[in-house]
Amino acid sequence: MELSKASIENIFNKNEKEYYIGLICKSKYDGEEINEPLDLSIALDISGSMNCPINMMTDGKSRIELAKNALNKLILNIKKDDKIALNIFNDESKTIFPLSNKESIFNNLEIIKNIKANGGTNLTNALNNAIENIIESKNKNKRIILITDMLDNNPDINLSNLVKKCVNELNIYITIVSIGSESNTSLADYICKEKGCNYFNAIEDTDLEYFLVKNLRYITFPLSFDFRIEIEKNDNFNIEEIIGIKKEDNQYYINQNAPPLNNNIPPPIINDNNNINEIIFEENSIFPSELTIKNGEIYQKGGLILIKIKLVNENIKPDINLKMFYTDIDGEKYNQNYSINLNDISNNLNYFSNENISTGISLYYYGFILKDFYKNKKDNIEKSKYIEKVDVCKNFMNKYYKTYDDKNEIKNKYLKDLNDCCNFYDKPIQ
């Protein structure tokens, strides 16, 4: 885990000082493809709604065409020891080919090309069929991938039990790659509460290929389970807020000297219950992250956790002690201790120990402004007062938002969102 810290003036109240701790989880497998053999059972949604474009507001390629293209590239890029089974589903489910190696699957590429979409959606049938196609596999790395727009309006009550059985009894993990912004994310969130399962939402034409081809080996191999971070309670500070910055389009600089997960592992713990600690973050499963090298620096794709600290007395700067717990894939439990001190930043205004935390705080204020849009309109706050807040936030982002993006396309998108809030402030809420 990598720690960073910051002290800033509240951008809306210069008399108020804020302290932040930033956390980024890292592992020794980040940026490295795991080359163990992988058995995949893929279920492809061919319901009628898959004929729609991925974004209902555009006239781009249909979801089914994008899915088939990504599936073809996935097959062409798998390792020689990997195996894939494919079933298609609408109201019913049908196996296109059983668990097969790369060479055998090539004979079925033309069949995939000719798949058409029609009918309704039954995810329970799809999952049942996907399980049947992989249940006899002896490989320890077994995963089902559901490629679907998740528009199952009448999900079977047995689906939740089937998911639990798949993961906990059969040791088969599930990945959902949903297509479109109107997907049933509540169902996906439920499935992802099971260990080893994860969920990705494709809302752009390039997303399916990104998840299923470029990042296949990052999203299919869990590193650890029951991951949590605790902070030691202290009378000298209070936790004001915990902010999870999980923007898919953000990457954060990695300090190569920071100790990664599963490196220099401490001995297994006997009892990890400690009532003097407060849980600040929990994740059912941890997966490796993609790394990007830009101008000689290494950036990690993934999320930043911000802890907003309120000091009881500005003259007392306590150590902030944290503890990380996790269970490895073999069931062994581990913990690691971390500590960070605020003394060296107490007299500095707008101090950031690295660009990760300045970017994270920028996004925190950006999110605050977007949420404030509706609240201000509801409370009939004058537009001029709202615009003042937006301008302050834009100035902060322009100065402190840093990413690997040379063209600043991501930052410019956020700034455009803020401008749109001002432009649409006078219009009624739909």
Task: Name each region found by the language model.
Residues 136, 140, 157-173, 179-329:
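Acidic, polar loop-rich interaction surfaces within structured domains
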Residues 95, 238-239, 332-336:
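Surface-exposed loop/edge segments in extracytoplasmic proteins
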Residues 62, 99-102, 158, 243-246, ...:
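Short, solvent-exposed coil/turn linker segments
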Residues 1, 260-430:
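Long, acidic serine/threonine- and proline-rich intrinsically disordered regions
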Residues 38-42, 244-249, 339-341:
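Short intrinsically disordered coil segments
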Residues 5-228, 312-314, 416-430:
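Exposed acidic/Ser/Thr-rich ligand/metal-binding surfaces
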